[in-house]
């Protein structure tokens, strides 16, 4: 299984597609196995958290739905992280180093500062189980412009909201320090813990 080269289709996606089609093939070839109506759908853009943005739930019409993914044999996941994305754009001011005292605003250094203000032990490397984290996925910049890209994850909804509030407060404090909006935060939710919905529909 491969893509046409114009889309992202990693080995985990290929394995998932293979598993699903193999299961369908098995049911078709073994009509003696009793089962209800089975519907299959494939969604794009999983890696950017937009896989079901245009999925027509009403048209699909089913009582129960499962996402099939790679994992241990027999494993069923019934909960997941609450997920958000934080994109921070920083605009600096480049001045000749020889005359930059109290004038230059180094966007790259501000980006480093923002990242340093986040909890040191709340990264994917330092957490496990139900512990949430901030994950810096991209960092680039120079004196005039810098960019930070984070994913924020937490199982608990209240802790999730606190994490978003905290990164917002960091950006606000940096802007207050410089007396202008040197850093602009674009913060948005991507998806939520499905356990809350399952608990509402027991």
PLM feature spans:
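Acidic/histidine-rich catalytic neighborhood of metal-dependent amide-processing enzymes
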Residues: 2-79, 131-133, 137, 148-155
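A short glycine-threonine-serine/GTX helix/turn-capping micro-motif
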Residues: 7, 95-102
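Beta-strand secondary-structure signal
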Residues: 39-41, 85-89, 147-149, 184
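Short, solvent-exposed amphipathic alpha-helical segments in soluble enzyme
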Residues: 56-59, 82-83, 105-106, 165-169
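His/Glu-based metal-binding/catalytic segments typifying zinc-dependent metallopeptidases
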Residues: 78-79, 83-84, 88, 97
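Short, solvent-exposed loop/turn segments at secondary-structure boundaries
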Residues: 78-79, 100-102, 196-198
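Metal-dependent amide/peptide-bond hydrolase catalytic core
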Residues: 107-202
């Amino acid at each position: 299984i491969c893509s046409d080269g114009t889309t992202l289709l990693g080995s985990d996606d290929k394995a998932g597609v293979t598993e699903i089609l193999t299961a369908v093939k098995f049911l078709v070839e073994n009509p003696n196995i009793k089962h209800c109506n089975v519907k299959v759908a494939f969604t794009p853009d999983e890696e950017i958290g937009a896989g079901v943005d245009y999925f027509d739930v009403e048209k699909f019409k089913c009582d129960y739905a499962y996402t099939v993914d790679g994992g241990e044999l027999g494993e069923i996941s019934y909960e997941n992280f609450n997920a958000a994305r934080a994109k921070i754009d920083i605009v600096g001011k480049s001045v000749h180093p020889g005359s930059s005292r109290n004038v230059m605003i180094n966007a790259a250094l501000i980006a480093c500062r923002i990242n340093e203000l986040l909890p040191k032990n709340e990264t994917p490397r330092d957490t496990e189980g139900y512990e949430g984290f901030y994950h810096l996925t991209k960092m680039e910049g120079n004196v005039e412009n810098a960019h930070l890209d984070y994913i924020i994850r937490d199982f608990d909804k209240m802790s999730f909201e606190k994490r978003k509030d905290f990164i917002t407060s960091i950006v606000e404090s940096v802007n207050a320090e410089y007396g202008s909006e040197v850093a602009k935060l674009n913060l948005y939710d991507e998806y939520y813990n499905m356990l809350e919905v399952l608990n509402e529909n027991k």
